């Protein structure tokens, strides 16, 4: 979306992804990946010129979305995962 005009965003089957062989690894490597991505994205997104936020891509489930929309979607997605983890911890007494 930042490197290509009007690109199509590729989706994937989350259930299949969750069953990949690396699901048995400790949590730490996955958290390190997420932390690294967030460091890179913070650097990239904070340096974007204003006009980049209106760049468009096609999302198979949402239709046309802007860079601004995608940041909101990703942020909401992360908050939802954090809530799921918090709720699971409360249910399990962790």
Segments and roles (model prediction):
Residues 1-17, 42, 56-94:
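Short, contiguous alpha-helical
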Residues 14-54, 74:
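Acidic/histidine-rich alpha-helical segments that form the ligand environment
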